[in-house]
């Protein structure tokens, strides 16, 4: 059975990779589908994210990387996938993902959403958090694949960190 794991992956984290690896054990094939959303200001281009995810998942023979525009459920239908794979960290993730699952089901009754809870060590992790840490020069090597850590370091050593006002 084919599953689609959609997201922006800006950047991919070890939490994402954990879900991908576990999904790859459950499904015959997993498509990591990188959403192109022109409304969001991404740190990395879609092309960079494709390369990052491909490098991070190269050890998984039943995982492929693709991009899409538009509705996730329509992308899944175009790929003949009947399962959306989603990761859950906290209760608020579940509330949002449940709403999205019902919405997707209303758009295409054949689609199912499979939720995997994140492993404990990644329950706090998000791409936004990683970018914030990297932006201020913090170490992110334990949060993202090695290739992504290098990309983040290169990105933020070229971009000056805004100065903060001294504490009074």
From Swiss-Prot:
It catalyses: (R)-4'-phosphopantetheine + ATP + H(+) = 3'-dephospho-CoA + diphosphate. It is found in: Cytoplasm. The gene is coaD. Homohexamer. SUPFAM superfamilies: Nucleotidylyl transferase (SSF52374). Reversibly transfers an adenylyl group from ATP to 4'-phosphopantetheine, yielding dephospho-CoA (dPCoA) and pyrophosphate. PANTHER family: PHOSPHOPANTETHEINE ADENYLYLTRANSFERASE. Pfam families: CTP_transf_like (PF01467). ATP binds at residues 8-9, 16, 87-89, 97, 122-128. Pathway: Cofactor biosynthesis; coenzyme A biosynthesis; CoA from (R)-pantothenate: step 4/5. This is Phosphopantetheine adenylyltransferase. CDD domains: PPAT. Its EC number is 2.7.7.3. Keywords: ATP-binding, Coenzyme A biosynthesis, Cytoplasm, Magnesium, Nucleotide-binding, Nucleotidyltransferase, Transferase. GO terms for molecular function: ATP binding; pantetheine-phosphate adenylyltransferase activity. Belongs to the bacterial CoaD family.
